[in-house]
Amino acid sequence: VKALLGCGSLDENTYIITDEASGVSAVIDPNFEFIKAEDAVKGLNVKYILLTHGHFDHVFGADFVHTTYGLLPRLSADEQATYAAAAEQMRMFLHRDFPLLLPTPGAPFAEGDVIAVGTLRLRVIATPGHTPGGVCFYEESEGVLLSGDSLFDGEIGRCDLPGGDEDTLVSVLQRKVLTLPEDVTVLP
């Protein structure tokens, strides 16, 4: 797992998951910095753009990956409206207009789906609450959970944005994330 850490005050992380055996990779939550990080994907066999949710800071670099690799970003069906509103979110947070090109999403995934990245298996865990259709990706054999904004470093994700619901997020995390093995590494 290669991390491209957060950008400025938004502090969003992008991850590149690569299966060592096959060289197949997935880009998860391509952020603002990602479009300046061409070297991070140079020579990789990128097969997926995976989004934990549709907030603008997690999708800003999706068009770069789409243009470079001809891939469509994938997110949950319940997250399509959040993704479609990314430019509006950016205006709300940054108080200015930026060009935000969003490729049409590819096939949505759902709770329990398994995405094969070479020999790695990312299981989709639906974790609504930060957004209506947010997810985490769990790779059991490596003991890694990619949490998006469902979990921050040391705390739960914020729930005060449109579509957020703290009770839902807490309940989901208790039922689905806290039941994972204790030695799981969480990558927010």
Residue positions per predicted region:
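Conserved beta-strand hairpin/beta-sheet module of binuclear metal-dependent hydrolase folds
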Residues: 1-44, 136-148
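Active-site HxH/HxHxD metal-binding segment of metal-dependent hydrolases
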Residues: 32-116, 120
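Metallo-beta-lactamase
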Residues: 89-92, 121-188
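Short Gly/Pro-enriched turn/cap motifs at secondary-structure boundaries
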Residues: 5-7, 104-106, 126-128
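Divalent metal-coordination and catalytic microenvironments
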Residues: 17, 29, 53, 65, ...
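Residue-level marker for buried hydrophobic side chains located in beta-strands
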Residues: 26-28, 50, 73, 146, ...
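Short, glycine/acidic-enriched loop or turn micro-motifs at the edges of active sites
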Residues: 22, 32, 56, 129, ...
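Residue-level marker for the onset of beta-strands and adjacent loop->beta junctions
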Residues: 13, 24, 105, 111-113, ...
